[in-house]
């Protein structure tokens, strides 16, 4: 029975990749106007994203078995799927091929696709692809758009505090968003900063950490976008759009039109 189940999941994963070849998806993304090559992202920003999301990214083959086992044990204890144990490669697979359904069969297919992505794309292109489609809350996908949305400045002008702030958003982009929920985000930021400081070779020095800690929830960063009608109203439409069309509805450049009420700000992203 389990063998047949595995064969079915494997066949499903193969069909998805045949319909939407990973390399073709990657090349299509590089041709879009908001594409940001990995080489244009500050090296420290990349290091922070990798360290906080998947510290073993450069050594695993797409799947971290220890994290998967830990997630399964915690989910069994919670009696529902709460923890994913996902690597960066698995998150890329989820963003490219799956809707927001949470079940073990989808996770199994996600694992198989992640293993295939490692072979077909390699680490550099996976990371390049990842930073261009990762969700940063408020309907913002991709690092380039996130920098413009949250700080209104070019990537090259980011401060260390802003880099760290952006690196902390992806794990909880909605419920821990720094604009709508600054107090929640502050707790997330502090936990992650302490995690990095405990490393044998921390990416952030004690002096730099003290500077980041100086920003509390009342001012996470002086340049951070303030709450407005757009950030208050627009996120309410995201669950509807994702449920109706899926996360990858526009991944090939197809237009998706959505109309807002007159009270919604017309400030552009």
Model-derived regions, located:
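Juxtamembrane regions of bacterial inner-membrane/periplasmic proteins
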Residues: 1-269
